[in-house]
């Protein structure tokens, strides 16, 4: 997954983060100090391509948030694949968004941030099942944040053990755990 760092997206705050925990520079500035700030006129897409080239990355997956991802994928389809970002709190809208973006933009994946939703939506919550079923139907992998979240939000919705039931109920679902599943890496590998 690749994110475009630009002045508009550099201080994204998930809706579940309390006001006092939103940070001055970014949502995790209590852990990460002196993070560079992108200027308005920086070309985030070209900088990303340059960084990909420098690191031997041929193609990258970008989430359809803001305008940069779609612009990048349309201008450089050989370099960028698109991913739909959904909030399971509105189940039918999430399913429709997956279908619409897959048809219009040929998205290659779906993602959601369980502890970033407001209210939180656990990995194994009933609201996620229509999303998983749609991913199986369209042959799309789903990227789900797993383990302790970076922002100061409650992490139970992302507990790695919650994948067990989902894996059992959806044997054909391709799941990609994001953010390392820490501190339950061994459990993640077993699942």
Label every model-predicted segment.
Residues 157-167, 186-191:
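Short loop-to-alpha-helix "cap/lid" segments that border enzyme active sites
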Residues 174-191:
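H/E-rich (His + Asp/Glu) clusters that bind or coordinate divalent metals
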Residues 50-58, 76, 137-138, 169-175:
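A structural motif corresponding to the C-terminal end of an alpha-helix
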Residues 59, 65-158:
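Active-site gating/metal-coordination segments in enzymes
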Residues 49, 98-99, 132, 164, ...:
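Short hydrophobic/charged patches on amphipathic alpha-helices used for structural packing
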Residues 1-4, 145, 179:
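Histidine-centered divalent metal-coordination motifs
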Residues 1-59:
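An N-terminally biased module of ancient metal coordination in phosphate/nucleic-acid-related enzymes
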Residues 103-108, 160-175:
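Structural recognition of alpha->loop->beta junctions
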């Amino acid at each position: 997954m690749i994110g475009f760092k630009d002045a508009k997206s550099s201080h994204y705050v998930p809706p579940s983060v309390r006001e006092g925990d939103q940070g001055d520079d970014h949502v995790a500035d209590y852990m990460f100090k002196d993070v560079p700030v992108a200027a308005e006129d920086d070309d985030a897409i070209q900088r990303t391509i340059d960084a990909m080239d420098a690191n031997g990355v041929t193609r990258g997956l970008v989430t359809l948030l803001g305008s940069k991802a779609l612009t990048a994928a349309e201008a450089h389809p050989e370099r960028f694949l698109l991913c739909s970002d959904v909030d399971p709190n509105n189940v039918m809208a999430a399913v429709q968004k997956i279908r619409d973006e897959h048809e219009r933009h040929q998205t290659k994946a779906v993602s959601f941030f369980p502890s970033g939703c407001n209210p939180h939506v656990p990995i194994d919550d009933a609201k996620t099942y229509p999303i998983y079923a749609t991913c199986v139907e369209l042959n799309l992998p789903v990227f789900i944040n797993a383990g302790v979240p970076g922002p100061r939000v409650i992490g139970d919705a992302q507990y790695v053990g919650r994948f067990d039931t989902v894996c059992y109920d959806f044997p054909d679902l391709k799941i990609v755990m994001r953010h390392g599943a820490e501190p339950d890496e061994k459990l993640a590998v077993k699942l």
